[in-house]
Regions:
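Metallocofactor- and cofactor-centric catalytic cores in central/energy metabolism, strongly enriched
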Residues: 1-124, 131-166, 174-188
Length: 188
């Protein structure tokens, strides 16, 4: 439970029972690809999440910014957090920035999160969001002050789910909670 005995990593999680990893053999279309239906994978993931919740598991999500580009993706991930299927979140500055941009301005990367249409001058929206958050001094203060009520980071704050935001060399901002030194963030 405290990871003193190690951390279990299931590296063959998408292989079907009895299916072998064939990464060392040459074959064409022997396994799964983007063109393959993933319905069973989602069912398996739901079953795994339910099991972990029922058995007091500790589910850590590692998300990238693409999870915040669509209103429905933000809603579903937010609901997973709210319903107790996330005990911690690991991400970068970009996920938090664009998710909070979605709650603040209704855009991510300047595109409407409902229809993906570009807003005029929308490419500045993430910078406006970063500046607003920095003016408040923290993500929770920004969420409260601006009345944000949706999204991934909002749900982490509302439900006291810890998150670690690790920086990269390309980050705009970054946000106040971002670990700018990658190794410090990794150690967190």
């Amino acid at each position: 439970e405290d990871a003193s005995e190690g951390i279990y990593v299931h590296d063959d999680c998408w292989l079907r029972e009895g299916e072998e990893d064939s990464k060392n053999t040459f074959a064409f279309r022997q396994s799964r690809s983007r063109e393959t239906s993933f319905t069973q994978d989602y069912k398996d993931l739901v079953e795994l999440l339910r099991y972990e919740k029922e058995h007091n598991g500790y589910v850590v999500w590692v998300l990238g910014p693409a999870c915040s580009f669509d209103v429905e993706a933000r809603r579903v991930m937010g609901e997973l957090i709210a319903q107790g299927y996330c005990q911690a979140l690991l991400a970068g500055n970009a996920l938090a920035t664009h998710d909070l941009e979605g709650g603040y301005l209704g855009t991510a990367l300047g595109c409407d999160i409902e229809n993906q249409k570009l807003h005029f001058m929308g490419h500045y929206n993430h910078l406006d969001t970063i500046n607003a958050i920095n003016t408040y001094g923290s993500i929770p203060a920004f969420i409260e002050g601006e009345g944000i009520h949706s999204g991934i980071i909002y749900n982490c704050v509302k439900h006291n789910v810890p998150f670690v935001l690790n920086g990269s060399i390309r980050d705009d901002g970054p946000l106040p909670e971002v670990y700018e030194h990658t190794y410090v963030g990794q150690d967190t």
